[in-house]
């Protein structure tokens, strides 16, 4: 198999293999089916390139255009799409069953900020020593987080015990 053209690029000028092509002019007008060599000559006359637009068509559809400009516009579109793409992160807040009110409010403020930024938030209650006997206190704290963030988040994953911890996941409610 010949490898004249890298897989991600389009064929242009002499790289086009077909003998005849359906030609589209620089302004988008149909010029009909002509030989590849005539099409290349026509493009060179105008100082432009012959670019294969639809290789699978019979005969292939080619367009007279400035390949450098075309490539630049494609790159810009790709960058723009990448910019619009958001990466959702999982932030974690750790609390203890004996967390005091002020500390709870600080942690709650952090959770609310994470959710407003569009990140998922994992709330973990970790137990030390004999505290594990009082799992109900941990569940109470997790329920309180759910109640205090119900305007911003929905419960994504119910509270579950894992070793010496209780964990739950909050996901932001999508903005409309």
Curated annotation (Swiss-Prot):
Any one GO molecular-function label of the UniProt entry: translation initiation factor activity
Cell location: Cytoplasm
UniProt xrefs under Gene3D superfamilies: Translation initiation factor 3 (IF-3), C-terminal domain (3.30.110.10), Translation initiation factor 3 (IF-3), N-terminal domain (3.10.20.80)
A Pfam family: IF3_C
Keywords from the named record: Cytoplasm, Initiation factor, Protein biosynthesis
Main location: cytoplasm
GO aspect biological process, one term: ribosome disassembly
GO cellular component: cytosol; membrane
InterPro entries recorded: T_IF-3_C_sf, T_IF-3_N_sf, Translation_initiation_fac3_CS, Translation_initiation_fac_3, Translation_initiation_fac_3_C, Translation_initiation_fac_3_N
Domain of life where this protein originates: Bacteria
Subunit structure: Monomer.
Physiological role: IF-3 binds to the 30S ribosomal subunit and shifts the equilibrium between 70S ribosomes and their 50S and 30S subunits in favor of the free subunits, thus enhancing the availability of 30S subunits on which protein synthesis initiation begins.
Similarity remark: Belongs to the IF-3 family.
HAMAP family, sorted: IF_3
Name by which UniProt lists this protein: Translation initiation factor IF-3
Native species: Nitratidesulfovibrio vulgaris (strain ATCC 29579 / DSM 644 / CCUG 34227 / NCIMB 8303 / VKM B-1760 / Hildenborough) (Desulfovibrio vulgaris)
